[in-house]
């Protein structure tokens, strides 16, 4: 009798939790149905991994959106001198980034510090060294924030630096940048939204790295264009992600863009305007424009046929030379005919072998 009472007391807590278990089970089935529906629309996602973090993700996203810096860069856009200084400074920053192998966020932070600083301080046209010293200080600070190993201050001055500054001068400039920026060295950037979307939607591993790499590469390629200063990080991130999704053909571009704009709470008109500018810098368009600008061949006119790769819309050119009056083109044409004949023979032999192998013995 005592044993039966002890068993009942031990099983009591589990009986109390039976109701909760049933509710969780029904909720689980609903989540599975939602995940199945989402996987059909987005086969590159693995949504089941992040369902339990939805509330935390919503709070994080709201924080990112609220902490965005206001777009107050009209002063740069209206000043040709500042635009030119910015182009030279960013060109040097990206060269040093490649030289030392810094990550993309380091370069982006340096650009953010530089833009915020030059809008708060007046650059004097009679001091051309000022922009390079500012870029040097901003990159040094960004590396200290983001990188594990940071070069010495004197070692930053590589990649055709026009001026060489002492370490004390760079340190004083760093303090001036820090005080001007109110020591706010962790701004919200488009990369913040890239990381959030990848984690929120739980991209499959073989898509995650490629998607992030393409987004960061496209971002760094368009940042030197001062026109993008008029867009917030969330708008810029949305336009870039839609462009990358379009190139990778992961899912329906329109559906993905609609979901992103709803999630990030961005204006569709601004996103479309930014997207048009992003397309001017897209790799596929650049490859096509570079091919169209190539000079005509002196031997003959090339008829090019383009085939678009389904994975990244890369253009592949297969050109065939037309008959020319020049005698030097005859050996080329003869070799081409011989190659075509060999290809036909190999294909016939392959078909003949397939027929023999499939015939009953």
From Swiss-Prot:
Factors inducing expression: Up-regulated by the transcription factor ERF114.
Pfam families reported in the protein's UniProt record: Cyclin_C, Cyclin_N
Keywords attached to this entry: Cell cycle, Cell division, Cyclin
One GO BP: cell division
Chain segments annotated as transmembrane: none
Stated role: Promotes divisions in the guard cells (GCs) after the guard mother cells (GMC) symmetric division.
Family: Belongs to the cyclin family. Cyclin D subfamily.
Name of the protein this chain belongs to: Cyclin-D3-3
């Amino acid at each position: 009798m005592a044993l039966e009472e002890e068993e009942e007391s031990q099983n009591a807590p589990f009986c109390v939790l039976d109701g909760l278990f049933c509710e969780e089970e029904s909720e689980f089935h609903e989540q599975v149905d939602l995940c199945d529906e989402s996987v059909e629309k987005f086969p590159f996602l693995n949504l089941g991994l992040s369902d339990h973090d939805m509330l935390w993700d919503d709070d994080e996203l709201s924080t990112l959106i609220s902490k965005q810096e206001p777009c107050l860069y009209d002063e740069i856009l209206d000043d040709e001198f500042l635009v030119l200084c910015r182009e030279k400074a960013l060109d040097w920053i990206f060269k040093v980034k490649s030289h030392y192998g810094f990550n993309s966020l380091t370069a982006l932070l340096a650009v953010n510090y530089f833009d915020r600083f030059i809008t708060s301080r007046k650059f004097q046209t009679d001091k051309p060294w000022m922009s390079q010293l500012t870029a040097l200080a901003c990159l040094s600070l960004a590396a200290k924030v983001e990188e594990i190993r940071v070069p010495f201050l004197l070692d930053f001055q590589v990649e055709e630096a026009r001026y060489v500054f002492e370490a004390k001068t760079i340190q004083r400039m760093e303090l001036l940048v820090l005080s001007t920026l109110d020591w706010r060295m962790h701004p919200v950037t488009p990369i913040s939204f890239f990381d959030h979307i990848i984690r929120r939607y739980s991209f499959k591993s073989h898509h995650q790295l490629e998607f992030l790499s393409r987004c960061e590469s496209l971002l760094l390629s368009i940042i030197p264009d001062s026109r993008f200063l008029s867009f917030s990080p969330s708008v810029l991130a949305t336009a870039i992600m839609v462009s990358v999704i379009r190139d990778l053909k992961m899912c329906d571009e329109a559906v993905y863009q609609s979901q992103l704009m709803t999630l990030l709470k961005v204006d569709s008109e601004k996103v479309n305007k930014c997207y048009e500018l992003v397309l001017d810098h897209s790799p596929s368009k650049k490859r096509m424009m570079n091919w169209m600008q190539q000079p005509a061949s002196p031997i003959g006119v090339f008829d090019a046929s383009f085939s678009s790769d389904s994975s990244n819309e890369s253009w592949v050119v297969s050109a065939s030379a037309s008959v020319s009056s020049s005698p030097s083109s005859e050996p080329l044409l003869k070799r081409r005919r011989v190659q075509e004949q060999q290809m036909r023979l190999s294909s016939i032999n392959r078909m003949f072998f397939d027929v023999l192998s499939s015939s009953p013995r």
